[in-house]
Amino acid sequence: AVAVDGRPADLPSALAVPADADRETAAQRRVADWFFAVLVGAQVLLAVAVLPLLRRARRHAGPVGPAPVPRRVVATVELLLIAAALAVPAALLADVVPWWRGDHAGAWFAVVTLLLVAGGTAAVRFAPGHAATLGPLGAVAGLATLVVGADVLTGARLQLNGVVGYSALEGGRFAGLGTVGLGVFVAGSLLCAGWLAQRVPRGWRPVVVVAVGGIAVVVVGSPYLGADSTGAIALTAGVSVAAAISTGGWLTVSRLVWAAMAGLAATVGFAVVDLRRPPAERGSLGRFLAALGDGTGGLTVHRASGANFQTLVDSPLTVLALAAALLVWFALLQPWGGLKRLFGIYPAMRAAMAGTAVAAVLAGLLGGSALDVAGAAGALVVPMAALAALRVLDHSTDRTRPDDGGPANGRLLAAPRRPADDELPAGPGAGDGTADGGTAHDGAATPGSTPDPAARASTGAATT
């Protein structure tokens, strides 16, 4: 026998490696079912618990109004939302520890995952900028992108036979980004792009989104990294939409044309690269184009349609995607939900979330995984959207004191207090809420009067 570099020199050690992989694969199949069931149940229960908080999150400036939610309750719910968003990245990172070698593999996986979730939540909670409205969102998106991106850059070892990865026994994929990893990476990278774009001047926001999104597209589509050309095309479409509306406004015809041109250019580029590879190494896009060339493209479309339908019916991530869509449409996007206010104040975040929705849905349909990619992305995006909406509503009655005749400088003021009758000065207007000179005590001015500079308070939301 001849020893080969990089391989075990003795036979028992060589046999231990595939045996350990078999144990991991068997444990992964058992644990994955209940993990996703618990994830879906926890996210749905958390969504139901958030609804009454959204209703009462807006603090009323006047003397009459519903009692606000106690700060401790809000802080606890925020921590639960952060933990829910970090559940999938923590489950991916749990494979660093060989939990499958124990007698109770499922229990060990649960313990390791919960410890990682707790550590990630604590890191987000005590990170600088946590008090800002978008602070937790940016931190969670950064952690999720870092975990999945680092795994892809190091060979995707955590996703192979991982609970939130893919199984070698199924034979669908042996390297690169899996379905769940793609959803988390798409959502995390676009949220990071939106968070960074919101911190730069308006004219530079599309540049930031394209720069961050372009790096993510390369990671997803490179045959040596993510090896998912259809996912890269979907992500390109999402980045194009996000960049087009990152400065505010709607997706006009001209913006849509530019976004479509960018997506078409990326599609052609990945198609050329994939077709130049050997037939055995081509991705789904290259195989589909080759099938079109020899007249068997219809069979490929039929197989993809069947895979989409089967996944749509069987996968628990379908339930998670539908629950996330219902929460967004019937709660967060309502006038009391706070998401419209968030989008108005932070247009780059609206662009990032719109791009995430486009990319996740397209990636699932093109890749034959139906709503699985959207469900994985929603597990990260929706809890963070709910948290940001809660914070925006909580700041809805904040005031900013402007400089003398100048724009608001961001200092917060409490809501103006109406003085008691015995505090009102004598003279004209006494007792009716106005003082001498015609200036109202609530900051409004009567006709013909000049309000005091300190009373000209802006009603805009506090900025981060």
Model segments located where?
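Soluble extramembrane regions of membrane proteins in the secretory/endomembrane system
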Residues: 1-30
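Core alpha-helical transmembrane segments of integral membrane proteins
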Residues: 19-165, 180-193
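Short aromatic-rich membrane-water interface segments that cap or initiate transmembrane helices
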Residues: 26-34, 165-185, 224, 289-319
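Hydrophobic cores of alpha-helical transmembrane segments in multi-pass inner/ER membrane proteins
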Residues: 42-50, 110-128, 176-196, 234-248, ...
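Membrane-interface helix caps and helix-loop-helix hairpins in membrane proteins
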Residues: 97-103, 220-229, 365-372
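Membrane-interfacial entry segments at the cytosolic side of transmembrane helices
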Residues: 129-139, 202-207, 248-261
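Aromatic-rich transmembrane-lumenal/periplasmic boundary elements in polytopic membrane proteins
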Residues: 135-152, 157, 257-294
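Long, compositionally biased intrinsically disordered regions
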Residues: 253-261, 270, 282, 286-417, ...
